[in-house]
């Protein structure tokens, strides 16, 4: 028999984008996803964390989530949904409605449960997956975002985060392997930063771990796992050259650095315990992101480009207007430039999000490199401010700003 599965992650319901809510975008995605689940007669939906954008999501975001679960079940009553918590989610809040959601064939793992003897309850992390005939086809190792202390301790009791998380997946795999029947597949879920995961150069939507101190090697996931469904990184990709270890990516771009990501869900089949028919299913984008101009240009050139944008039509749906980031090349700070941009866009069918200034490099100035973890331990805060100011504005830090910074440092040191 076979099991049809779809993997998604990083919905970030309730996110605001530079002050604009994204309700219509999320609603369009969820409606599309229900159609895909129904059309493909999907047996299992895996949601690999960051359902919500914040730990205390709005009532509207929670309603949207619960309404999706209800509608997905109504269109496909046999659909099984497995959800793990991400670092943006409140694990306890996500688990709170479990008694009700069990009626919708939905399993949620937010926290790592422990037994009365304070050992990890591995059974609670194993979710059986059934085919349309009600036969168990696979076992899912549903591991939520792990924090310090969530993973099994070593005998020495001195673990790095990477060692602890790796031990968690290996021990859980061994336990699940002992519980499965012949022909049953094992698959895993996780919300973490995997070693070698690709990001765009200016991606700041998820915290980049300094020096890779908390990135998990693909070797943590046993090669006999039929599939590993990951969340946390917003760029859809396979990891470590293994087709079966994947980030689904976010359904919406969470920042302008993600505007060229291929937003998708991953569909695949488990056939007699083996992975087959793996396919990336593109998600239609409701609202576009535009950077104008494509490269920073002078204020006059920027304003000329903005004047050529399409006019707004009376009664138009503003939620369909593209988000706009303006890039300008300045020789010195220009406090009035934003006002001129806003005037130029007053009758245009776009939504201004930000104006990003850049400054020409001084002659002989080399490209700056990011500070390493060791650098950050050695550099003084004032030196960091001076370095950042010079890189951003091309000049020395003004004395009045240095004085203000020193005053603040004295206050926080009291």
Locate predicted features.
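N-terminal active-site segment of His-dependent metallophosphoesterases
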Residues: 1-70, 74-78, 407, 411
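Active-site neighborhood of phospho(di)ester-bond hydrolases with catalytic His/Asp-centered motifs
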Residues: 8-9, 45-49, 80-87, 107-112, ...
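Active-site neighborhood of divalent metal-dependent phosphoester/pyrophosphate hydrolases
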Residues: 12, 42-60, 76-92, 194-212
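Active-site environment of divalent metal-dependent phosphoester hydrolases
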Residues: 14-15, 53-56, 85-95, 147-151, ...
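Metal-dependent catalytic neighborhoods of phosphoester/phosphodiester hydrolases
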Residues: 18, 51-68, 85-104, 110, ...
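Conserved catalytic scaffold of divalent metal-dependent phosphoesterases
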Residues: 104-211
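Conserved beta-sheet core of the metallophosphoesterase superfamily
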Residues: 194-274
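Accessory, non-catalytic peripheral segments of nucleic-acid enzymes
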Residues: 270-414
